[in-house]
Amino acid sequence: SPRSAASSFGGEGRSFAELDWVVPHLPENKPRHLLGIGLVEDLFIGVSKGIDTFDCVVPTREGRHGNLYTSAGELNIHKGLYRDDPRPVDSECACEVCAVKKISRGQLRQLFKDKNRTAGYLASFHNVYFFNNLMAQIRQAIAEGRFEKLMAEKLSSRS
């Protein structure tokens, strides 16, 4: 509607073709919000097509199931190889889990194994921080005219 403060649309599909036809018709002076899109690759595609904000359950849902997002890619903390791993979830992360409480991969894995509810909270907290930090990096890269370079770096490090 003409009085709308923003435009929003979305859903969990893998096709972004709709953005190519919808975004050119949205007002440029209002935020463009995409719903249900929360994977790293999808955020970069959305931003490259003119989307400003996103929301999705991915960071918390995946966290509750022991899937963590890191600068090197996704990590499933349930795998046995993390049993005695003393490293933080992500050595490049400054979140409370990684940098302040210094919860190791082994400790977090054990919390999940013990069915301790704190495990899902810690993993979700880390994931939300990861995505907030990623979006801050994207905003800075756009302001500095290096979004394409950041996208190439981040996506190549995840393969």
Model region roles, listed by residue range:
Residues 1-89:
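Glycine-rich phosphate/ribose-binding loops and adjacent secondary-structure elements
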Residues 90-159:
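C-terminal extensions of enzymes
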